[in-house]
């Protein structure tokens, strides 16, 4: 069904061309008749030359038929060209745009994929060079250097001070415990000595 409009159009063009060719031949005959009427007593040879003979007319008819056949053959042999629809044109433009966007890819995804050792690659379009965003603890152009942790002197001083205070407190507690035990033992021993002296005195008194 899609080929029908193009075939009809070509047939119409062929008919127009054949009409034009026929019109040209009729125009020639009219010119000859006009020349004959303008010269009423022309020589016999001139009139015979202007008026076509039967053989000439038959030849012209054959030529016209051959021309029409050639036009019809050309019309049927040529392949119809599909008309471009707006939808197809839009799809073509979208495909072209997609191809153009595909060329502008991030070089860090392919060319500089392994450029940063311990970090993330970021391409600087203005400078046209890759840059690395290093992970914590790494430094350098390609994040290849390891940053060693440095102790804070203030933090070290505070830690030492706390340990010293704790040691002093524990030592003081130990000394207090030792002193308390000694005092308790001495007090107990003093009471035991008094009891023994009283027993000795009582024994001596009973012996007398």
Swiss-Prot record:
Glycans are attached at residue 85. Residues 82-103 are annotated as: Disordered. Keywords: Cell membrane, Disulfide bond, EGF-like domain, Glycoprotein, Growth factor, Heparin-binding, Membrane, Secreted, Signal, Transmembrane, Transmembrane helix. Disulfide bonds join 108-121, 116-132, 134-143. The chain crosses the membrane at residues 161-184. Residues 24-160 are extracellular. The keyword Disulfide bond applies. O-glycosylated. InterPro entries: EGF-like_dom. Residues 185-208 are cytoplasmic. Most abundant in skeletal muscle, lung, spleen brain and heart. Coiled coil: none annotated. Growth factor that mediates its effects via EGFR, ERBB2 and ERBB4. Required for normal cardiac valve formation and normal heart function. Promotes smooth muscle cell proliferation. May be involved in macrophage-mediated cellular proliferation. It is mitogenic for fibroblasts, but not endothelial cells. It is able to bind EGF receptor/EGFR with higher affinity than EGF itself and is a far more potent mitogen for smooth muscle cells than EGF. Also acts as a diphtheria toxin receptor. This is Proheparin-binding EGF-like growth factor. It comes from Rattus norvegicus. The gene is Hbegf.
């Amino acid at each position: 069904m899609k080929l029908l409009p193009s075939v009809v159009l070509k047939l119409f063009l062929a008919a127009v061309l054949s009409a034009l060719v026929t019109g040209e031949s009729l125009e020639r005959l009219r010119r000859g008749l006009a020349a004959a009427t303008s010269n009423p007593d022309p020589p016999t040879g001139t009139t015979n030359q202007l008026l076509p003979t039967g053989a000439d007319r038959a030849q012209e008819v054959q030529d016209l038929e051959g021309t029409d056949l050639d036009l019809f053959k050309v019309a049927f042999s040529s392949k119809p060209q599909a008309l471009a629809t707006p939808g197809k044109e839009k799809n073509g433009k979208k495909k072209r745009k997609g191809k153009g966007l595909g060329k502008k890819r991030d070089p860090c995804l392919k060319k500089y994929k392994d450029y940063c050792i311990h970090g993330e690659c970021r391409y600087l379009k203005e400078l046209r060079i890759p840059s690395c965003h290093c992970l914590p603890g790494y430094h350098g152009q390609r994040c290849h250097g390891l940053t060693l942790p440095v102790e804070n002197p203030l933090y070290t001083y505070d830690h030492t001070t706390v340990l010293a205070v704790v040691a002093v407190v524990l030592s003081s507690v130990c000394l207090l415990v030792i002193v308390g035990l000694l005092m308790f033992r001495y007090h107990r021993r003093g009471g035991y000595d008094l009891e023994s002296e009283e027993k000795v005195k009582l024994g001596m008194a009973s012996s007398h």
